[in-house]
Swiss-Prot record:
MF terms (GO), sorted A to Z: ADP-ribosylarginine hydrolase activity; magnesium ion binding
Record's function text: Required for myofibril assembly and outgrowth of the cardiac chambers in the developing heart. Appears to be catalytically inactive, showing no activity against O-acetyl-ADP-ribose.
Keywords: Cytoplasm
InterPro entries on file: ADP-ribosylarg_hydro, ADP-ribosylglycohydrolase, Ribosyl_crysJ1, Ribosyl_crysJ1_sf
Annotated gene: adprhl1
Pfam families named among the record's database cross-references: ADP_ribosyl_GH
Annotated GO CC locations: sarcomere
GO biological process, one term: protein de-ADP-ribosylation
Protein name per the record: Inactive ADP-ribosyltransferase arh2
């Protein structure tokens, strides 16, 4: 249970840290500013100065739905729709990801049959589906529940990001969270993701009427991940990952931009989880190194921070992070409560 709580808390820590430097496109400048503040150990995160972004709030909202006493998945989807639409009110004053806003505008909470059915969205490839789905993998972490994980992560993703690069990002982070709970070797996660994509495609073919318009970008997501695994030398799921000898902040920014689709690292559903995964591979149990790679870079650092922080919590718990980062964190008690209730819900078969 402690690691479920740590996942929710450290995900929010990563989000809050990343949000602080969201507008800065230079990782070296960000790291320089952090040193001037005394480093990570000197920071005291609180609600006033380090508020959570829309990404963390949508992750919490998804978790809220997953711990309700729903009878069937359709009831869960209706609850997700209701909470997502309500969440748009609580996000006022923040700058939510555009795809999330547009997706929620298409949801129909009062239409019993079509509540979560949204049209294909050419602009729905953003990271917002990926950043709200780790809790889905925590809820359905058991290997025998893979089918449910695939279905729920895709449907929750499509509600706000009905585009393969968007909703496959949701599948990716949910899957990675389940692997973390299972204790699977980290180096195998990417290969297992690619092995799961055919199951996702089979589900989509059964449920999406016009699958043809999804096909091209589906292959893009798959190809980007295949390329990444080959670059790191881990396409077999067991070799030791290969990193460049020079891997400072500038090199990190250059590499992350290369993985992106439009030059802004972590903006899309394929590369936000990719950056988080790469940082986890490189950092091991070193929280500060994880932050340097997954949060203190010149891209969409709140998204990559949220994903990586959550997965780090599932792998290593809370003790590796300085107390000041989470002791007075925005919504700390709520995050811990959600972690505990996700753990208990996952233990009960439905």
């Amino acid at each position: 249970m402690e690691k479920f709580q740590a996942a929710m808390v450290l995900g929010a820590v990563g989000d809050a840290l990343g949000s602080r430097w969201q507008t800065c496109s230079s990782g070296s400048q960000i790291q320089q500013e952090l040193r001037a503040l005394g480093g990570l150990a000197a920071l005291k995160l609180d609600a006033e100065h380090w508020p959570l972004s829309d990404g963390a709030l949508m992750h919490m909202t998804t978790a809220e739905a997953l711990i309700t006493d729903y009878w069937c998945l359709e009831d869960l989807y209706r609850e997700l729709v209701r909470l997502y639409v309500e969440a748009m009110v609580s996000l006022q004053g923040r700058v939510p990801e555009p795809s999330t806003v547009e997706g929620c505008a298409n949801l129909k909470p009062h239409n019993f049959l079509l509540a979560w059915h949204t049209p294909f969205n050419e602009k729905g490839s953003g990271h917002g589906a990926a950043t709200k789905a780790m809790c889905i993998g925590m809820r359905y972490w058991q290997p025998e529940r893979l089918h449910t994980l695939v279905e729920v992560s895709i449907e929750a993703g499509r509600m706000t990001h009905n585009h393969p690069i968007g909703f496959l990002g949701s599948l990716c982070t949910a899957l990675f969270a389940s692997f973390a709970v299972q204790g699977r070797p980290l180096v195998s996660w990417g290969r297992e993701l690619l092995k799961t994509l055919p199951k996702a495609e089979e589900y989509c073919r059964k449920t999406i009427r016009h699958m043809a318009e999804y096909q091209e970008t589906w292959f893009y997501f798959e190809a980007k991940w295949q390329f990444y695994l080959e670059e790191r030398g881990i396409e077999d799921g067991q070799s030791k990952p290969s990193f460049p000898e020079r891997y400072d902040a500038d090199e990190t920014d250059r590499m992350y931009k290369r993985w992106s689709s439009e030059g802004c690292a972590g903006r899309r559903g394929h590369d936000a989880p990719m950056i988080a995964y790469d940082a986890l591979l490189a950092a091991g149990s070193d929280w500060e190194e994880l932050c340097r790679r997954a949060i203190l870079h010149g891209g969409e650092s709140s998204a990559t921070g949220l994903i990586s922080g959550c997965l780090f919590g599932l792998l290593h718990g809370l003790s590796a992070a300085p107390t000041g980062l989470h002791q007075d964190l925005d919504r700390r008690e709520k995050l811990q409560d959600l972690g505990e209730r996700l753990y208990r819900a996952a233990a009960l078969e439905k």
